[in-house]
Amino acid sequence: MCCRFLLCYDDSLMSALPFHPIVAEWFTTRFASATNVQMQAWPAIQSGRDVLISAPTGSGKTLAAFLSCIDTLFQQAVRCELRDETQVLYVSPLKALSNDVQKNLQQPLSEIGQAALASGMLLPELRVVVRTGDTPMTERQQMLRRPPHILITTPESLFILLTAEKSRAMLKTVRTVIVDEIHAVAPNKRGAHLALSLERVASLTGVEVQRIGLSATQRPIETIAKFLVGNRNPSIVNGHTSCEAVSRKPLAISSAPCTIIDVGHRRDMDLAVEVPKDELGAVATNAIWSDIYDRVAALVEAHRSTLVFVNTRRLAERVSHYLEERLRHLGDEVVAAHHGSLSRTIRLSAEDRLKTGAVRVVVATASLELGIDVGTVDLVCQIGSPRSIATGLQRIGRAGHWIHAIPKGRLFATTRDELIECAALIRAIRAGVLDRIEVPPAPLDVLAQQIVAAAATQSWDEAELYDLCRRAMPYRDLDRSTFDAVVTMLADGYVTSRGRGRAYLHHDRINHHIRGRRGARLAAITSGGAIPDTANYAVIAEPDGTVVGSVDEDFAVESLAGDIILLGNTSWRIKGVGTGKMRVEDAQGAPPTIPFWRGEAPARTAELSAEVARLKADIDHRLGAGQALSAGSAPPVQWLRQECGLDQRGAQQAVEYILAGKAVLGAVPTQQ
């Protein structure tokens, strides 16, 4: 069922919005109605309590969070109380999402400012700045000289900002933190790292900073709420709005420290599994791949804008290259690639062209998976299984990224196992099954980084630093002996094969104080974060010296001058490989070799694995003992077509696969 929305128009909408009249008027001129999630979120946010918003893609979550913050800043400007200080901190797990949010904020800020000027109010500009690893040094320096009112960053850059001396001072005035796509970081070490950084922000400001979490897919939602607010034993208010509800009253606000706005994750979706003409096997043949490229190209031509997701950067380059060959008749540069090993310039260009419709199709990895505005994409293709239910929902939700739209997704199976997995995924999505999020308990490597960073900025009482760490939800059960052991290791140094490593802390065991040694701050800034280091070589285009992207170290050292490689859907001829750098020149479309990157493919989640096992068991049950398959007449075939988005050929191949496995093994493997 689709989530229903409040239908408020004109004066009735104006009066319903809890904003300054100019801000409210801007909203009514831009939108015909406010969504249900927005009408519930705004009073909750303006109450000052922590808020977690869980809603489908395209339901207006980001605007729900930001418009209240913009209204607060605007009203300060009206009262001549707006200072040149950072009050709103927005954290997203992707640099692409950070850049996109900045662009999407510039327009409302500009239009609200123009509306104020038209009303006779000359107000200071509300400034928004992005600070990530891609931010040029000049912009970083300008930000320190004149802090933005809204700062957009990533978890890793927030850690650096908290640790560097000058930027740290800028964060003392933060009053609201917005964590977008919180489900993407909560179940891994990046989440633990961010949770500690949020507690350091709260400690730095000396006040209770309001926290707003945004996510599209979460289960259990109470765990994510606790992750957001930290270890304060919150009593969670569940403002659940079921998708089947015809209408809902605005959320009743209570005195609880965290409010959950949950309008569910289920939407009507147009889902199907695409099966190649040749019969699928254990591995994909060249003929199968060729048929997949042909079918994707045909779908691209039949739609205005298409987003193709793959699971690896190598496959992104490969698919974009072969689609380019098949779609050349549509014009030049109608296909673009997008992944984390491309330069910022190339990624931003692909994002802009996708949003404006300048390209017909973009082939991407997880780099475009989260809430970036992808414009009017009306089809998402997934090559192979996305390996998790949440990822499948998130990626397919990129299509129809506007209110009331029905996302359209096509999953392309490349093997028999992927056929079953894709069918199980569609069945799970239709049934409302979600992956379960589990927060990793107290990763000590992350704890050590944050202790060094915190001690590098000021002297700490041991007990106070221990309490700060335990306020972060992943460390709520951290015992004192473990904390002391980590501190001792950092203060005494640790033994390696080359001898004892350097110590980062001064530990006063008499007065129980901790402070950083010389070099601790630099070590924290240069070595912090939970994203694994990779030995990549920068790819530099000559003669202008433009950075095109990066390739894996092993690929770089195996390459020779004169080789042609593909990066960003462009052929490059290698001129030379040096220390950490690969110099290239435009190869003018010559046939290329596709680079590889190590350690890319995602693992399958436990929930999707359970759905795969359940589907196999259900097919076996419907076949009946000893029943043979003949010309698609087996009972499960029609059931698979209705339940799992398979066509006749795909359903028949799925049944044949189960029968063949049972004939060899004597039983259908399940999790029982």
PLM feature spans:
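Conserved nucleotide-binding/hydrolysis modules and their immediate coupling elements
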Residues: 492, 497-614, 626
